[in-house]
From Swiss-Prot:
Zn(2+) binds at Q256, H259, D357, H416. It catalyses: L-histidinol + 2 NAD(+) + H2O = L-histidine + 2 NADH + 3 H(+). One of its GO terms (molecular function) is zinc ion binding. One of its GO terms (biological process) is L-histidine biosynthetic process. This is Histidinol dehydrogenase. Pfam families: Histidinol_dh. NAD(+) binds at Y125, Q187, N210. Its EC number is 1.1.1.23. The gene is hisD.
Length: 428
């Protein structure tokens, strides 16, 4: 059950803000073995691991066009409409992030500029596990398509009958995924990192997963392929004062807790009354949840923290740097201006985390484990590279050249200096 903490001292903060431990190092030997086998044996190894881990015997990894077409008829019109609405909002928000480059003359005759280009080949990992995360398909494939990624590869584990959830296939087709493969876990990450007979090698891998997937992404990113960001268990913090609705707050905490047993939900509040009411409401709502066993286990990692004022609440919040932050206070826009460490922020009593998880338009692939102090969530920028260009004309070289020569000489790099000198000699 959630722990009630009242007026902790600053000396206690570090202990209070600890996340559930995610020890991937102990898994590295196992994960490395799987990666090496897939790298050496390709499809054969992936198929063997699918049989061992996902308990399914597959004849091929590739999802056929017939399977994709059939999926549309297997989900309700209501769900198709919801997915289409979410896709439209995600597309609208991420399209607004398009880079507009401009040429800058840093001095007369010296011009610099940038060009944004999509990463040519990207791999998206969509977990199977306890729920079909078709929303993550939209969060990753939509910005990849806007960025101009030429090849968008998706891997997701099949069920025991060898089928992919139809909502995942529908979302993938709607968002413009190029190829879909029946592969999960470490073997899927390895297949995208190194390529197999079926699965193309990609340049960057995106998507959440369990501790094995996290370890695999860490290992392949050491030298072979880029990844989106360091990942850990999902988390939410609600920052609230006496004006907050305890029913809403409890619902938000539980919506995070049902993600998985290692998720974390935190309330930081200035109201002792709210703290007590939220505890009571969490217990009431928990009893009605289908995934209550998972949520209850997660709540053991979770805390309801009472602090003396909003200044302290914000200081503690910025120290925690939550993946998701819900601000339910009287003057939430003013409070939000003082938030400097968070992945995504949800403002006011009518903005639950679920909105960003699914359909408001922001991305739900976010930094966890305190990485919001240094990392951003996935955005259009995650799928592009910015190439810099520069052009120097004669009048520019005459002015900038001597400065370059002087700097190169003082760094004892004579060839650097000479590359300028030979050009200046032609301009005399």
């Amino acid at each position: 059950m959630m722990k009630l903490i009242k007026y902790p001292s600053k000396e206690q903060w570090a202990e209070l803000l600890k996340r559930p431990a995610l020890n991937t190092e102990s898994l590295f030997d196992t994960v490395r073995t799987i990666i090496n086998k897939v790298r050496a044996e390709g499809d054969k190894a992936v198929l063997e691991y699918e049989a061992a881990f996902d308990k399914v015997t597959l004849s091929a990894l590739t999802v056929t066009s017939e399977e994709i077409q059939k999926a549309e008829g297997l989900i309700s019109d209501e769900l198709k409409s919801a997915i289409t609405l979410a896709k439209r909002n995600i597309e609208t928000f991420h399209s607004s992030q398009r880079f507009v480059g401009k040429k800058v003359e840093t001095m007369e005759g010296v011009t610099c500029w940038q060009k944004a280009v999509g990463i040519e080949k990207v791999g998206l990992y969509i977990p199977g596990g306890t729920a079909p995360l078709f929303s993550t398909v939209l969060m990753l494939a939509v910005p990849a398509k806007i960025a101009g990624c030429r090849e968008i590869v998706l891997c997701t584990p099949p069920d025991k009958n060898g089928n992919i959830h139809p909502a995942i296939l529908f979302a993938a087709q709607l968002a413009g995924v190029s190829k879909i493969f029946k592969a999960g876990g470490v073997q899927a990450i390895a297949a995208m990192a190194y390529g197999t007979e079926s699965v193309p090698k990609v340049y960057k891998i995106f998507g959440p997963g369990n501790q094995y997937v996290t370890a695999a992404k860490q290992l392949v990113s050491l030298r072979d392929v880029a990844i989106d960001m360091p990942a850990g268990p999902s988390e939410v913090e609600v920052l609230a004062d006496a004006s907050a609705n305890p029913v809403f707050v409890a619902a938000d905490l539980l919506s995070q807790a049902e993600h998985g047993v290692d998720s974390q939900a935190m309330l930081i509040t200035t109201s002792e009354k709210l703290q007590a009411e939220v505890m009571e409401e969490v217990n009431r709502q928990l009893a009605k949840l289908p995934r209550r066993e998972i949520a209850a286990k997660s709540l053991e990692n979770s805390k309801l923290i009472l602090v003396k004022d909003m200044d302290e609440a914000l200081e503690l919040t910025n120290a925690y740097a939550p993946e998701h932050l819900i601000v339910e206070t009287e003057n939430y826009l003013e409070v939000a201006e003082r938030v400097i460490n968070a992945g995504s922020v949800f403002l006011g009593s009518l903005t639950p985390e679920s909105a960003g998880d699914y359909a408001s338009g922001t991305n739900h692939t976010l930094p966890t484990n305190g990485y919001a102090k240094a990392y951003s969530g996935v955005s259009l920028d995650s799928f592009i590279r910015k190439i810099t260009f520069q052009e120097i004309l004669p009048q520019g070289m005459k002015v900038i050249g001597p400065a370059i020569e002087e700097m190169a000489a003082n760094e004892l790099l004579d060839a650097h200096k000479n590359a300028v000198t030979v050009r200046l000699n032609t301009l005399k």
